[in-house]
A protein has these predicted regions:
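Predominantly flavin-linked oxidoreductase catalytic cores and closely associated redox partners
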Residues: 1-139, 155
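FAD-dependent flavoprotein oxygenase/oxidase catalytic domain
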Residues: 11, 24, 111-113, 135-136, ...
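Glycine-rich, flexible loop/turn motifs
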Residues: 67, 80-82, 150, 159-160, ...
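C-terminal helical "tail/cap" subdomain of flavin- and related membrane-associated enzymes
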Residues: 198-294
Length: 294
């Protein structure tokens, strides 16, 4: 396997019935041509590959926007526990704090475009969120914010996004597979990458359309039901009444509290209850990303 580091995509030179050729360039501006059976485009929301194919959507800025910063010297409960805050003015967005090592956390918030706050207001809103009593208390009085914040758009429209073209398969943010309820996209990106590999293997020595159709079928099977479920729940969470009702249900017992987090961050698929083909023996029992607290 040949691995090229420090290179970037330039353009799609040609597509033929049996291969695709692309131009790439290195950090020292040295150009090179690469030929392969397929290109898997994992190049983000703004996908230069998609743009090269003339498939970009003018004016598209994503469904969500996220804002994040790291902090250290955390002494409150956020040091060891995952926190999710459903602030009334952020709904259906939310704020989060993920514990890291040595008293550090990843803390931030996300908003749905078209909500109460614009993307341009996120920077000014940040100090206000950090000063709110319950958030400040979770971090502790000695918390130190690190470096600068980062912000980025989140594409979450897998049911309408282009997934393939010719001998190109789009995955991850390039395929807009991000969860439309939480904005989480790492797991979705990994899964879409696996599905693209399965589709290519299934179409070996056959027309490109076989691989494209297989990939789109796999994406539909693995993402569409979850996307629709997330969109429905997002509508409910837009109101404070809906959010309170959902949290009351989640807070009924230690079991519901524990599995709400597993479900929200998709240790199990979002719509798993309605897609029996994805049930398995250890359903809701396997370990997630964070330690269980009863």
């Amino acid at each position: 396997i040949r691995v090229l580091e420090g290179h970037e995509f330039v353009s799609v030179r040609e597509q033929t019935p049996d291969h695709i050729t692309i131009d790439i360039s290195s950090n020292n501006n040295k150009s090179e041509t690469v030929q392969s059976k397929f290109v898997i485009a994992s190049d983000g929301m703004w996908s230069p590959v998609r743009k090269s194919l003339g498939m970009s959507t003018p004016g598209y800025l994503g469904e969500w926007h996220a804002f994040r910063q790291y902090a250290n010297n955390v002494t409150g409960s956020a040091k060891d526990r995952l926190h999710v805050w459903f602030e009334k003015d952020l709904l259906p967005g939310y704020a989060w704090s993920f514990p890291l090592q040595d008293g550090r956390v990843n803390i931030g918030f996300g908003i749905l475009r078209g909500g109460k706050y614009s993307v341009q207001q996120m920077k000014d809103l940040w100090p206000n969120l950090l000063a709110r009593k319950h958030i400040a208390g979770a971090l502790g009085s000695g918390v130190v914010m690190e470096d600068r914040h980062t912000a980025w758009p989140i594409p979450a429209r897998v049911t309408s996004a282009p997934l393939s073209s010719g001998r190109v398969l789009f995955i991850g943010d390039a395929a807009c597979v991000t969860d439309s309820l939480t904005g989480e996209g790492i797991g979705q990106a990994l899964l879409s990458g696996q599905l693209s590999a399965r589709a290519i293997l299934a179409g070996i020595n056959r027309e490109a359309s076989v691989t494209r159709n297989k990939y789109e079928q796999l994406v539909k099977q693995n993402f569409f039901a979850d996307h629709r479920m997330s969109a429905t729940l997002g509508t409910i969470l837009k109101s404070s009444l809906g959010a309170r009702a959902a949290l009351r249900v989640a807070n009924l017992t230690p079991w519901t509290r524990r599995n709400f987090v597993h479900w929200m961050f998709e240790d199990e698929p979002r719509a798993a209850a309605f897609t029996p083909r994805r049930w398995h023996k250890g359903f809701l029992k396997r370990d997630g990303a964070f330690k269980n607290y009863g």
